[in-house]
Structure formats: structure tokens, C-alpha cells
From Swiss-Prot:
Record protein name field: tRNA pseudouridine synthase 2
GO CC annotation terms, alphabetical: mitochondrion; nucleus
Organism: Schizosaccharomyces pombe (strain 972 / ATCC 24843) (Fission yeast)
Location of the active site: 97 (nucleophile)
Chief location category: nucleus
Region (Disordered): 1-30
GO MF terms held by the record: metal ion binding; pseudouridine synthase activity; RNA binding; tRNA pseudouridine synthase activity
Binding site for substrate: 157
Amino acid sequence: MTSISKRKNQQEHIPAEDLETPKLPKREKIEGTKESNKVRIIILLGYSGYGYHGIQINNPLKTIEGDVVAVLKKLGYLKTNNIDAEHLCIARAARTDKGVHTLRNLISLNLFVDKPLDISLLKTELNEALCSQIRVWSVFPAPKYFNPRISCESRTYEYLIPSFALLPPKPSCPLFKKMQKNLSRKLDNELERNLVYSMNDLISFWNTVKLKQKEIQEMFDTNKDAFTNPFKGMFYEKPIPAGIVIPPQAKLKKALKQAEYYCYMNYRIKEDRLKVLQQLLKKYEGRHNFHNFTVTDDSTSPSNYRFIESVTCGTPFVYENWEWIPVTIKGNSFMLNQIRKMMAHVLMIIRSCAPTGLIDKAFDPNITMNISKSPGHVLLLKDIKFSSYNDSVTDGLEKIQFDCFEEDILSLKIKTIYPDIIKLEQKEKLFFSFLSYIDQHTGHQFDYLFG
């Protein structure tokens, strides 16, 4: 597995899978090839997206399809020098962008060979030649005019929320001061009451942080020259160049900040708080106008409508002492930034005790909300479905299904993707930065939470 320290984090986007693909000009015949030498195939695969600028070829950037095509050329399955994306007719079931991970995706493309193709060997050859971030589950022939984007009926994503992201803001920050209006408002329904009551219980979290920081301060005051950070080695730290001496006050500052991280790390979400999250997420289900959750110039455009089949919270799990909440979102297709904004909107409502009706208001084409994007490194494409295609498969063609690869898929998830996601968060603290920006914001971007 490629070291996490060598992978540059990239923020992902999720373009709409149902947008029309631009029509390509008529392809010229490739020199030195015959139509009989062209074979169209389907590749089922999964991958960790770190270091990649998405799946789609976008030269000169490093992409998943770019690596696959390069390996196919090296293995002799593209017997020409002037092959390009147009002649490959390459397509995918779900277009993932920078940094997005995938357990189950599909690409389809043309091969150009000068001898009979033994497709049974291709999976093994690809896995041996590709980096360990990309794993091929299966390779088999495709119908001549197969379009995976259109044939794919649904896409399922998973978004990992760190439990500490549901904690209230610091009492000293601007967001906490603004949200006092929300805490004192009239509570119109049970969900509103549950939200506020769960918030009141969590205010004590910051007392725990203060006590921990007080212990650190007392240790420092006793003997500042001999002070040692009790959290040293517990959290990622940038290497200190040789010969550099860290002043005592700098050591104290770092220890006080890491005391806060320590409390975050040990926080475990309570059932009532988790229930509020699930009830709010359920409001996304159904067909809605998601104009506030993407980039659009026309809030009334029919293209803003999406059908969300389900949004569910999984059981929180602990990985290397940090607790995470998996949220699964299933829908037909998704627009640019849609899932990240959906998650951010819910987190903002919970953390500020805002009216729960703000989710419904966000669907109103006459209301504009400047919703932030939550971090993208925790987004994972879990599944794609081709039920109608599978029902219509004839002439000995294989169905598109992943059932017999579940063990390998689980291994990719547990051994590569999850560790990459979580270690990156620990190293870059992307959620900490996101929440800190919101908590310290003094402008008017988030005024819709307190109106």
C-alpha cells in the first residue's frame, strides 16, 4: 500500500452522472488496425483515490482511467501509438473526482489487439501491473454499444462523520454566541426538543477540556524547563529539524491544543444525539430541488431535482481510538458537491441548534442559502446497480454483479481505504479546520441558521 505521507490529499467533486455526454466527432479509422481487432470490455474495479485527480482521463493529470489505459498499452492490448480517449470510447458508471474512493465502479472501453484475446488472463495481468490502490474485480466482454452511465440505475455513497463533529462549538467562539438565540426559541416539535436537550447535555464537554488543560498548565507552572508534553507521540506532528530547540511556551501551547484533541478523540456519541442526526438525514429522502446543494445559475431548473431513495446512519465504530459514524446515501444520481453540502447542512443545524425546518426550506427555489461544503476526503462510492441491464443480458454476456468479490472488496475497504481516510484526517485535521472556520466566522454567511 502506498504510504499515506506520499499521497497528496485532493478534494473531490461529484459531477451529475446523468448529464448528457457531449457527442464526439466521427472517429477516423486507426492506422494499422482492423475492425475485427477491436474488442469492447467491461472492467469492474475499486480504488483508493488519494493522489488521483478523479477517475476520468484528464491529461496531464494522474487519473484512475489514465493508469488503467497506460497499463493496457504496456501489456500490448492497445496495439497502436495514436490511441486516444475518443477511439477508446471509454465510459464509467459513476464519475468520481479528486480524492474520492470507490469499492464498486465500472469502466468500459475498446481494446485493439493483433491476436485473439484471452480475456481470462486480463484481470490477473492488470492487478499485477497496477498499483495496490487500484484493484480489478473482473473483466469480461461488453455489448457493442454499452453505456454504463445510462444503464446504471442507482449509486450508493458512504460518508464518514467523526463523532466530534456533532459536538457544540466552544462557548467562547462567535458561533456559540450567535446560537443562544436558537437555544431560547420556542420548540415546536419533538425533534426540536430532542435537538436542544441533547445540546444542553453536551455543553459539559468543554468543562472536561478546561479541566484537562488546567492539569497541563499546572504541570508546566511546576517546572517549565522540565515540562514534557504528556500527549507526545499520540498525535501526528511535523518532524522538527535537527538542531532546533523548542521554547517552553511553544511546548505548552502545543500541549494545550493536543489536550483538546485528546478530549475529541475520547468523545463517544450518545444515542439521543445519534437519533437526532438520523431524523434530520431522513428529511433528504424523496424527490427534492437541491439547488442550494450544488452550483447552479437557475434555482428553478428541472436539472436541480434529484430523487434520494434512502439516507441512513450506520453503527458508530472506533478506529485507532477515534469514533466515526458511517452515513449511507442511495440515489439515482448526484450533482456537483451535493453530498458534501447535504452533510454540512445537517452538521451546521445540529451544532447551532438551528430550526430543523431549514432542511425543507433549502429545497425552496425562492430561498438561497450559502451552504458550505464539508470535507471530501471521507466520501466513498459503495455500490452501483444494473438490475434492468442484468435482466436483459443475452448471447452469453455476463451480468454486472459484485457478489463473488465481496471478500476482496471488504479487504480493500478495511486495509486500504478506511486507514487512508482516517490517517489523513489525523494528519491534516481537515474536519478540525472545517469546524474551526465555521465556529470563528464573524461574517453573514451563516445568518440563515439564526433567522
